[in-house]
Regions:
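ABC ATPase NBD Q-loop/coupling interface
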Residues: 1-13
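Conserved ABC ATPase "signature" region
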Residues: 50-68
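Conserved ABC ATPase signature
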Residues: 72-76, 80
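Hydrophobic anchor residue at the start of the ABC signature
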Residues: 86-87
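Catalytic Walker B motif of ABC-type/P-loop ATPase nucleotide-binding domains
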Residues: 97-100
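H-loop/switch region of ABC-family ATPase nucleotide-binding domains
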Residues: 132-133
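Conserved beta-strand-loop-alpha-helix hinge in the C-terminal portion
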Residues: 152-173
Length: 173
Protein backbone atom coordinates (compact mmCIF):
# COMPACT_ATOMS: atom_id res chain seq x y z
CA UNK A 1 0.00 0.00 0.00
CA UNK A 2 1.69 3.18 -1.19
CA UNK A 3 4.87 1.13 -1.59
CA UNK A 4 4.74 -0.21 1.97
CA UNK A 5 4.15 -3.76 3.15
CA UNK A 6 0.76 -3.82 4.87
CA UNK A 7 1.92 -6.50 7.30
CA UNK A 8 4.83 -4.29 8.39
CA UNK A 9 2.76 -1.09 8.70
CA UNK A 10 1.35 -0.15 12.10
CA UNK A 11 -2.44 -0.19 12.25
CA UNK A 12 -2.63 3.53 13.10
CA UNK A 13 -0.73 4.33 9.88
CA UNK A 14 -3.11 2.15 7.87
CA UNK A 15 -6.09 3.92 9.45
CA UNK A 16 -4.97 7.17 7.85
CA UNK A 17 -4.60 5.51 4.43
CA UNK A 18 -7.68 3.27 4.29
CA UNK A 19 -11.23 4.18 5.27
CA UNK A 20 -13.84 1.48 5.81
CA UNK A 21 -17.61 1.37 5.84
CA UNK A 22 -19.33 -1.75 7.11
CA UNK A 23 -22.63 -3.40 6.26
CA UNK A 24 -24.03 -2.35 9.61
CA UNK A 25 -22.72 1.13 10.47
CA UNK A 26 -23.60 0.63 14.16
CA UNK A 27 -20.80 -1.91 14.39
CA UNK A 28 -18.20 0.70 13.47
CA UNK A 29 -19.34 3.52 15.75
CA UNK A 30 -17.16 4.22 18.78
CA UNK A 31 -19.24 7.10 20.15
CA UNK A 32 -22.87 7.79 20.96
CA UNK A 33 -23.16 11.17 19.25
CA UNK A 34 -22.43 12.23 15.70
CA UNK A 35 -20.00 15.05 16.51
CA UNK A 36 -17.79 12.78 18.61
CA UNK A 37 -17.98 10.05 15.97
CA UNK A 38 -16.81 12.44 13.27
CA UNK A 39 -13.91 13.70 15.42
CA UNK A 40 -12.90 10.27 16.75
CA UNK A 41 -10.33 9.20 14.14
CA UNK A 42 -8.50 12.52 14.27
CA UNK A 43 -8.52 12.57 18.07
CA UNK A 44 -7.30 8.98 18.17
CA UNK A 45 -4.31 9.90 16.01
CA UNK A 46 -3.52 12.99 18.11
CA UNK A 47 -4.41 15.70 15.59
CA UNK A 48 -4.45 19.26 16.97
CA UNK A 49 -7.93 20.52 17.92
CA UNK A 50 -7.86 23.24 15.23
CA UNK A 51 -7.09 20.64 12.54
CA UNK A 52 -9.87 18.38 13.83
CA UNK A 53 -12.41 21.20 13.66
CA UNK A 54 -11.31 22.18 10.14
CA UNK A 55 -11.57 18.57 8.94
CA UNK A 56 -14.97 18.20 10.57
CA UNK A 57 -16.26 21.43 8.99
CA UNK A 58 -15.05 20.37 5.55
CA UNK A 59 -16.51 16.88 5.93
CA UNK A 60 -19.86 18.15 7.21
CA UNK A 61 -20.09 20.47 4.21
CA UNK A 62 -18.89 17.90 1.63
CA UNK A 63 -21.32 15.24 2.88
CA UNK A 64 -24.24 17.63 3.51
CA UNK A 65 -24.76 16.29 7.02
CA UNK A 66 -25.32 19.56 8.87
CA UNK A 67 -28.74 18.31 10.02
CA UNK A 68 -27.21 15.14 11.48
CA UNK A 69 -24.71 16.84 13.75
CA UNK A 70 -25.32 17.03 17.49
CA UNK A 71 -27.52 13.94 17.43
CA UNK A 72 -27.39 10.56 19.11
CA UNK A 73 -26.33 7.80 16.72
CA UNK A 74 -29.14 5.71 18.26
CA UNK A 75 -31.74 8.20 16.96
CA UNK A 76 -30.55 8.02 13.34
CA UNK A 77 -32.18 6.04 10.55
CA UNK A 78 -30.16 3.38 8.73
CA UNK A 79 -29.40 5.77 5.88
CA UNK A 80 -28.36 8.54 8.27
CA UNK A 81 -26.07 6.13 10.11
CA UNK A 82 -24.49 5.15 6.79
CA UNK A 83 -23.92 8.85 5.95
CA UNK A 84 -22.16 9.35 9.29
CA UNK A 85 -20.13 6.16 8.75
CA UNK A 86 -19.01 7.37 5.30
CA UNK A 87 -18.19 10.85 6.60
CA UNK A 88 -16.27 9.58 9.65
CA UNK A 89 -14.20 7.21 7.56
CA UNK A 90 -13.36 10.10 5.22
CA UNK A 91 -12.30 12.71 7.75
CA UNK A 92 -8.66 11.51 7.66
CA UNK A 93 -8.64 11.88 3.84
CA UNK A 94 -7.67 8.28 3.06
CA UNK A 95 -6.85 7.47 -0.54
CA UNK A 96 -8.57 4.08 -0.36
CA UNK A 97 -12.11 3.30 0.74
CA UNK A 98 -13.26 -0.26 1.46
CA UNK A 99 -16.99 -0.94 1.76
CA UNK A 100 -18.66 -4.19 2.80
CA UNK A 101 -22.27 -4.51 1.59
CA UNK A 102 -22.92 -0.79 2.18
CA UNK A 103 -26.44 -0.83 0.71
CA UNK A 104 -27.77 -3.88 2.55
CA UNK A 105 -29.84 -2.02 5.16
CA UNK A 106 -30.76 1.00 3.04
CA UNK A 107 -33.95 2.10 1.32
CA UNK A 108 -33.92 3.57 -2.20
CA UNK A 109 -33.42 7.16 -1.01
CA UNK A 110 -30.48 6.18 1.20
CA UNK A 111 -28.96 4.17 -1.67
CA UNK A 112 -29.15 7.30 -3.82
CA UNK A 113 -27.33 9.21 -1.05
CA UNK A 114 -24.70 6.45 -0.98
CA UNK A 115 -24.27 6.78 -4.76
CA UNK A 116 -23.60 10.48 -4.28
CA UNK A 117 -20.91 9.72 -1.70
CA UNK A 118 -19.30 7.15 -4.01
CA UNK A 119 -19.40 9.67 -6.85
CA UNK A 120 -17.71 12.28 -4.63
CA UNK A 121 -14.98 9.80 -3.68
CA UNK A 122 -14.45 8.91 -7.32
CA UNK A 123 -14.14 12.61 -8.26
CA UNK A 124 -11.61 12.99 -5.44
CA UNK A 125 -9.52 10.23 -7.04
CA UNK A 126 -9.96 7.69 -4.26
CA UNK A 127 -9.61 3.99 -4.90
CA UNK A 128 -12.92 2.40 -3.92
CA UNK A 129 -13.32 -1.32 -3.22
CA UNK A 130 -16.89 -2.53 -2.69
CA UNK A 131 -18.09 -6.02 -1.79
CA UNK A 132 -21.76 -5.92 -2.75
CA UNK A 133 -24.68 -8.08 -3.82
CA UNK A 134 -26.85 -5.19 -4.99
CA UNK A 135 -25.10 -3.96 -8.09
CA UNK A 136 -27.66 -1.88 -9.96
CA UNK A 137 -26.82 1.38 -8.18
CA UNK A 138 -23.13 1.01 -9.07
CA UNK A 139 -23.79 0.66 -12.79
CA UNK A 140 -22.16 3.87 -14.03
CA UNK A 141 -19.67 4.26 -11.18
CA UNK A 142 -17.48 1.18 -11.51
CA UNK A 143 -14.28 0.91 -13.52
CA UNK A 144 -13.91 -2.85 -12.98
CA UNK A 145 -16.04 -5.67 -11.64
CA UNK A 146 -14.29 -8.55 -9.92
CA UNK A 147 -16.06 -11.83 -9.27
CA UNK A 148 -14.65 -13.28 -6.05
CA UNK A 149 -15.44 -16.79 -4.85
CA UNK A 150 -13.92 -18.57 -1.87
CA UNK A 151 -11.51 -15.68 -1.35
CA UNK A 152 -10.11 -15.79 -4.88
CA UNK A 153 -10.65 -13.50 -7.85
CA UNK A 154 -12.25 -15.81 -10.40
CA UNK A 155 -13.00 -13.29 -13.13
CA UNK A 156 -12.45 -9.63 -13.96
CA UNK A 157 -14.86 -7.67 -16.15
CA UNK A 158 -15.02 -4.24 -17.69
CA UNK A 159 -18.37 -2.54 -17.02
CA UNK A 160 -19.46 -3.32 -20.60
CA UNK A 161 -18.48 -6.99 -20.26
CA UNK A 162 -20.35 -7.29 -16.99
CA UNK A 163 -23.43 -5.56 -18.43
CA UNK A 164 -23.44 -8.03 -21.32
CA UNK A 165 -23.73 -11.05 -18.99
CA UNK A 166 -27.11 -12.72 -18.92
CA UNK A 167 -29.23 -12.45 -15.78
CA UNK A 168 -28.88 -16.19 -15.25
CA UNK A 169 -25.06 -15.95 -15.40
CA UNK A 170 -25.08 -13.13 -12.85
CA UNK A 171 -27.40 -15.07 -10.56
CA UNK A 172 -25.09 -18.10 -10.72
CA UNK A 173 -22.27 -15.93 -9.48
Amino acid sequence: LDGKSVSDTPLYDLAAMVGSVFQNPKSQFFNVDTDSELAFACENLGYPQEDILQRMDRTISDYHIEDLMGRSVFALSGGEKQKIACASSSVLLPGIMVLDEPSSNLDMSAIDDLRQVLSLWKKQGKTILIAEHRLYYLHDLVDRVLYVKDGEIKQEYTPAEFDSLSDSTRKEM
